[in-house]
Amino acid sequence: MRIKKLGFLMFTFVVAMMFIQVVYADTTSEQHTHCFCGKTDCNNGKQHSILASKEITYTPFDGTTQIAYDSNRCAYIYLTKDVTLSVSIGATNATLYICLNGHKLSSSNLSSPIINNLKNLVICDCVGNGEIGNRGTSESPAIQAINVATNCNAYLYGGKIANNITNCSGAGIFIAKSANLYMYGGTVANNKSTQDGGGIATETGTINVLGGTIDSNIASNGGGLSVAKKGKINISGGSVSNNVASGFGGGIYAYGSNSSNRVTANISGNTEIIGNASGGNGGGIGTKDYATVNVSGGTIKENKGANGGGILVYSKWCYFTLSNCSIIGNTTTGKGGAIYQNGSLDVSNKVLIYGNKYVSSDGKTTSNNNVQLILSKSITCGAGGLSSNSMIYVTLDNKSSAITGAFNEDCSSQIISDDKNYFVAYDKTSKTHSLTQHTHCICGKTDCDDTSVGHSILEKKGVVYKAFDGTDEIEYDANNCAYIALPRDVTLSNSLGKEGATLYICLNGHKLSSSNLEAPIINNLKNLVICDCVGTGEIGNRGTDDSPAVQAINIANDCNVYVYGGSIANNITNSNGAGVLLGDSASFYMYGGSVKKNKTTQNGGGISVQPSSSGGVYLYNGEISDNSAVNAHVR
């Protein structure tokens, strides 16, 4: 009896100790608790309004047990280690919150998605290097990593959907009919599809990108994103970068098969579409029939395509609108470094399209090629009009075609020809813009018959001027002579000038200035000839009392300047000759125009001549007024 009783007591003691140990382990282990976005101190209401709760306690998941859903068909799990599944995670009409917790989630079953068939899927990663994917090869491809089923939703806040290789659309994520993806953060990267949408694809669903990165994915069409069959893409933040397509749309591909299946892409905010490439057309964005793309913000830059380095507007059924955006630094081996325009292109508000190039396949030949207007296609202007600080460079297949449809105002200072032999002119009757050459006498008049002094000094009267916008070097001919006219206001970073050269400048109603206050705007020319065929042109407008510049124009020893029009004005300096400084034996001939409102703390507010110089100032017409200096307007 004693032995039995002792044995019973020992058994009870052991069981009690086991119980105490289990309770002790439970009560001291840390709970995995944070907002469903992965942050512990989250206060971002904008990204959370679609979901109810912010603070969540997750239960551990290592892939060895089934996920337990509560009475509301909801579960919260976090990975305790890298997990490789044999079947998909998913449950009908269920909501699943997953924190990757810095681990990898994959599957050995290549014929089914890693995650599938959930009503709502919410993914975050509180650590920062978690990943879903990492499966499939070119020889043994998988299907997409995540399938967002019909009428279901997925929310991505963190983690990577990465390294999936598939032969179906949407290697990373596929959005089914009437389903939605909301991407607030995280990365979709390094996925590869032999079909459309290396990163994300949808047919009749909606892709919403509010943040995060879609990077380095590969597909036949739509390296980063693909939308088809009434689908929609809304991108208001984040980046689409370094994706590659062998066909259309290195970054984004939009394709509607017919009028009832038109697709839509809306791009806004600070979105960046950068560094994407297509072996076919549309390096940044490629459309193919029945697609509407609205770009109301962001930047499209440094993309490459066979046609349409930045954007491909494929056909008459493709509609593009651009406002408050920039398209810069894209390249093509065909036509349209920025945009290949063969459909409908509408611009409004502030649009910057410049610095895009044609680059030959061997890389040896480059030329300015921004918006390429195919055949007789043109640009239209939206209801908001085009702002004065817009800059749109164009190339025409047919130089006799109109560049624009009817514009309510003259935008010839905002729309500029890539071909420097042509300028853009506005016709007030038709309200359209077209190309024209800039030709007139050196004095600025088109009907000049003046044989008096001022014209006999120089040989040519009828001059064809080339456009100069400050982005390219001036080309001088065999006689070391160049003729340039400004297509818009130009601010230089270095002086205009070439030793021993003659430069004819028509200001064409625009301002010529420089951000470099330590160098003249114009310097070191043998002969400088200035005119202004419009009448409001100006050289200067720089320097302050606190930050003075040097003189606007410096004429070297034994050189000459001839002024027929325009104003040398509003220069503030602490050196001689705020407007013009003449070197020894240099001369200033004035037949029109003005030198005014210049200011110096030294001598010659308007013009300064060296005291011992044999040159001088010869005033035949024009105005030197309202300048200020220690000594005189002209000294």
List each model region and its residues.
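Extracellular/surface-exposed low-complexity segments
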Residues: 22-70, 74, 325, 348-481
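Disordered low-complexity repeat/linker domains
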Residues: 40-42, 55-56, 63-73, 108-111, ...
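Surface-exposed loop/turn motifs in large extracellular/passenger domains
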Residues: 89-97, 114-133, 141-165, 173-192, ...
